[in-house]
Amino acid sequence: MADIQKSEATLVKKVWDIANVLAAAGVGFTDYITQLTYILFLKMDAEKEELGLGSSIPDGYKWKDIVELNGDDLIDKYEEVLKELSKDDGLIGTIFTKASNKINSPVHLAKVFQMVGNENWYMMEGDFKGAIYESILEKNGQDKKSGAGQYFTPRALIKAMVDVIDPKITETVADPACGTGGFLLAAFDHMKPQSKDLSKQNFLKNNALFGADNTALVVTLASMNLYLHDIGTEKSPIVCQDSLLDTSDRMFDVILANPPFGTRPQGSVAVDSARPEFIKTSDNQVNFLQHIMSIVKTGGRVAVVLPDNVLTDGNATAKVREKLLADFNLHTILRLPTGIFYAGGVKTNVLFFEKGEKTRDIWVYDYRTGIKHTMVTKPMTRADLDGFVNCYCSGHLEDRKETYSEENPNGRWRKFSEEEVYSRDQLKLDFKWIDLTEKDDRTITELLSEMQEKATAIGDAVSKLQEILGGIDL
């Protein structure tokens, strides 16, 4: 195991060393990872063909047609290959969705080809090569300069959510805002050991998972992430689509998601034009909640990350809460601390609910009050959520026991009765009870890190505002 981890770390370092070289030349981290993905797929296809297993890529557009070229010939051929492969209507087309070259220097592009060419990827175990790629995605997601953090959910939180939802190998799992595929991959890892039956394993690899994202770049990364774990090797389970406009009738047993927050981007198709049954709102997170409610099967289970406003806002949001409590059993809320996401100050929760019965009691685990995390200096670990996972009692919710009591008023696990839930103004679900008057024990390093995270978030917001205002005559 130690040798495997060392090899993984060595490969990740090689990949990131080139990333730093390219960054100095003006190639962004995320653009580099995307090009690496395209080139890695070409190399793996070539290795597959050498083993007599056939090629998925048409003649004239393969690894061997590019790798010996240099200078402008390399750039021209590479761009021709990307354009051609993006036309495919299967797995290749998904990975090469709207593919274009972002490395304009032949010397730098050749470095990436050389680095990928020096390794044999296809025969690596799926867990190993997948772990390498995931490590790269995670490093990219944590790097503030990359801007990729908006697509990244902490692995510790993903793992805890999957552990308590407990998807089964015969069930279908969806993430309608899948990012780089973290939830789907964690669900796969959870389901795979449950049976060695070949038909069940085949179903798991090719039919059980579904993910969607409306950003071509993210679809490429998610598709490759799953492909490297031997998932969807014939047809990717990831599609490039705006989930909020999806009117298909496909339903799922389990939904796991951390949808984008904020308002819908300017110029987007209005959600209510495609989904007239939705309660009309401009909030992305509330619309995603409505979408999730519409695609989970009766008896199905949901775990979704949502900001505080979904629990407290009035008007349309209050009406969505009313529908949620009437048609679903919202049995659990996990209150999350700040500092675990790219947008450092956002306050979030995980809502756990099942379709079929109305909400009665709601159990709340407060992992926010008095808890401090940052993405860099004090990241959340899976062990940090052991208390919540143990209290949740997955599979036997009837055995739950509060840690809160009159004798222990700061217990983090508390049940709110049906009467308490439905007597709240506008069914607001912002349950708070812990009173910890603690000194602020953050170090200077932690404070500076939090300040940097917030400054980055503000800078990103200003840049987006400038883009919006750029086309307006003020």
What is each of the regions a protein language model found here?
Residues 121, 200-202, 295, 400:
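Surface-exposed acidic, glycine-flexible loop patches that form ligand/cofactor-binding
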